Amino acid sequence: WLGDIMRACRDAGIYDDTDFFIVSDHGQLNISRSVSPNAMLAKHGLIDVDADGKITDWRAFCKSAALSSQVYLKDPNDKQAYDATYALLSDMCKAGIYGISRVYTAEEAEREEHLKGGFSFVLESDGFSSFSNDWKGSYVRTLDNSDYRFGHATHGHQPDKGPQPTLIAFGPDI
């Protein structure tokens, strides 16, 4: 397709006056499973569910961004919920089996990754586990292609993981 664009510029007589930029995002990583941090939050009393598995209340909730997850507190000023959530997520990260390679506080995420939002924490994947929003069932699940976050490859990871971006620029003003 790049050749088609360049040919079209030549045919139109504008090739010598055109600047070309070829850029890419940082790509996708292959995954082998999905993990559900909300299942652990529920197990540890930070998400309350009824007998039918419906959420009745919550103090912390993970919102998936595929290979990362943003963790929100219902009341960001609730120090007890903050400490309990941070301790649980940190223990899961240290265990090395829950698909979490890093737990960022909101301040660390902003300072180190320039990521800012209403979240209290950000989870980064181990590179082969995608995060789910589910709070029911088992923590670890096999791949499920019914949701784009849980296919054989996905996005949402730190830019220094996986394939690196491409930037090629050429033309008369470059």
Place the predicted regions along the sequence by residue.
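Charged catalytic carboxylate motif
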Residues: W1
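Secreted, luminal/periplasmic, and some membrane-associated catalytic domains
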Residues: D4-F150
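Low-complexity, glycine/alanine/valine/leucine- and proline-rich hydrophobic stretches
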Residues: W135-I174
